[in-house]
Swiss-Prot record:
It comes from Drosophila melanogaster. Essential component for signaling from various receptor tyrosine kinases such as Sevenless, TORSO and DER. Required for photoreceptor cell and wing development. The keyword Coiled coil applies. This is Protein daughter of sevenless. Residues 132-176, 391-437, 686-721, 749-773 are annotated as: Disordered. The modification Phosphotyrosine is found at residues 801, 854. It is found in: Cytoplasm; Membrane. Changing residue 696 to K: Impairs interaction with DRK. Keywords: Coiled coil, Cytoplasm, Developmental protein, Membrane, Phosphoprotein. The lineage of its organism: Eukaryota, Metazoa, Ecdysozoa, Arthropoda, Hexapoda. GO terms for cellular component: cytoplasm; plasma membrane.
Amino acid sequence: MDRTFYEGWLIKSPPTKRIWRARWRRRYFTLKQGEIPEQFCLEYYTDHNCRKLKGVIDLDQCEQVDCGLRLENRKQKFQYMFDIKTPKRTYYLAAETEADMRDWVNCICQVCHLHDTKQSNELPLGAVGADENRTQHTSSSGGLSNSTQNTTTTSLHSSAGTTAPQASVPNAGGSAQLRRPAVIEEQPMPSNAGNNNSDSVYVNTEYSNRETMLCDANFDQQELLSAAQQQPPPSPATALYLNHSALIQAQAAAAAAEQLQQQQQQAARLAVSANGVVRKLPEHLVLTQQTLAEAAAQQHSSVQASPALSTASGPYIPISECFSGSPRFLPGVPLPGADLAIPNNPTTPLNNLDPKFYDTPRSHNNIGLNLTNDQSYSPKITNLSLQQLANNNASKQRSDSDSESVFTDDDEWAHPLPLRENVDRSTRPSDSSIENESFVLTYSQRFSKMPEEGGAIVPPAEKSSKLAGAASLPEAGDQGTLDKLAKVLKNKNNLILDFKENEKIPRDLPQLSDTENTSPAIVARRNAHSAFIEESYDIPRSHQQPYYNVNQLLGERPVTSPHNSNPIAASTPNLMAADLGAVAAISAAANPGLMGEAQAVASSPTSARTLPRHCYTNAAPTKMEGNVFRYDFMEQADCPPVNRKLKPKVAGGLPVVEDKPPEEFPAKPPVGVDQLTNKLGAAQLQQPIGPPSVDRKCKPNAYKLGNSATMSPATRRSSGAPLSMVLPHETDVHSPAAANAFFHETRTLPRQQHRHHPNSPGSMSVQHQRTASAAAAMMSLTAAAAPKQQAAAQTEHKLQYFDLDVTNKPPLLNRSSMSVGNLYSQGGNGASGMRFAGVEAGGARAPVPSSVVYRSVDFVKTEAFKRIREERESSGNK
């Protein structure tokens, strides 16, 4: 069933969430009945055609409606405003006329079964009938007109029998399209043309900064009745709804309001924060029957200004009014070692916060305008005395919606709330942000739900309560209570609101500041003798205390474990060994002189409590272990410096020569080729003593024919390292067998193939063996040494390369023209059929064919070098 009871234009308040261009928006509201009976919702759209739905307010969750609100700031001025309070948010709606505001309030109060909470000051106990009818006193409400001032009775529910005649009142709005439902038509319109006082507007003089703390003291039945009978006669200045079950509640509210007014008149003023911004709206303020002029006169004549409140109207305050310095404890909290609480501690903007306020991040759940006195967002100012705080903390009853945001938008903004420190207001000034303006907000009527017959004094809207402040703090020695409190407060995924919605019984939670609700370290600060904090997950700690839980970290491992001295081990505790005794034994084996000291220190529970300070971490707390990588702390006293699996021990126990680039080896003296054939086999079986010996045996070089000046250009290389060459005999310079045979050095850079220089000897064989792995490759020159060469290559895990250049490219011998892959990429062209062998001393130095086939190939590297060579060739052709 989608029946519309009421509709019209209203101006909706912006949200406190940091959205782009948040403003007071004009929306078209419709009051509709839901799918089931007695279910109502308030929908609002961008236009009167109801095409684009912007949001829905569930009136089943409505707890309270404040009528006659006024908002005045630099940019907005709303005279006819009311609010709808739900457990999750509070909506502030402004109408164009007072008639529209009254119509909306009456309709919402009827569908939500809300009643005026101020009736106790207007009617004696005997003035209420025993039936379900509500009594309505019609009186002056500036702007409406009626011929007589009368008293009529009407039923707020369709089930009641009596219906009052409808008062025909013209619509003063004119612009709003209103449909008056039947439930509204039963309401007589309060008006009085003869007594139209436009100044008789109720003002709230108990308005305090950020939060308003009210003392809802408990009274017994006799006190309630006596206080109700002492009230002045009913004033004709309100339009009210009551039933018989609401009288006791109303009497209690009246008595509490009168007492509160007397206590607060000495410090009552319109509170403005330090930067000229009022962040909180009053929630539980009781009306004082004063006009604006009377309130101003009383404020300027009898009010004694509090030194903690600023008199400046702008965003800045005089330096004389800035109170800072050493923060103090909350009122009523005894100092460590003291038996009595602080008797007089004037509340200043800073001293009701925790001492570590500036070092601790602010609470996530307090971002936005918060109305609770115990969940402050930033330094707060209160006008209450210590006695009021004590009374308030002793028997405070709070509503479910007290902790909710004041100004909220209709749209569901799902993104997280950014911190206020990160908002650059100079780049995005908002014309609707309440916190950027100084404003005055008052109300003239309040409607809330009434208890059942014979029920408690407190209405159901206030069934969830907390014991507040110092009166409910545990004793200094109650460590278990503080531990439980820390566990409750450390879960920041559940906001304080979730606690209120889910709790069925009052929780003994001390009323701490917003920083205390965030960090368990501050909870530990309450207990002076407790030096350690509860482990938490995502809350950085203050610099005031060590971050780690020293009892947990040091109680399980010795001081000499690598975790204490190794920064890597300290940063990765999840990989540490569980066997701490083995770790201590390893450390003692590495340092035998420290074994006794290690045992002595490890046995002392308080000997090592120096852990890193001034550090934040978001890592989850885990059990600390002894080392990072388990093999790092293995016993390696008997292990050789070289891993035997990777580098087997060679014959003779000599170290293996590293495979270095050719540029890193020193120059080698030339060795005759005649020595090569006799010693190649022995060189493979027994490695030379040093790298020079290896190079001499593996690099036969007939350097006797001349120096570097006598060499042909083909023998010169562009590298800076000296070259060891074997020049053939003059008689064999043009031998056909050596015409196409060249040995090129093994290089890691790609090289191009080259041809003989026209002026160079065609049979010259150049061998460049620069590494230890190349020495084993020379065994392939003889047939007898070939099996040994292959076995040695497999043993050493070394690779052998030969580059046979048989192409007909230009003979320019260039460093970039050599390629390791030439031997294998062109092996099918005849290079594999070439055989070479050393000759005897004094014989011809030209290479001769042999039956040895070069098959020691690393295919991975061969393919890699082949690709490099091809890329070089392709880039050179371009």
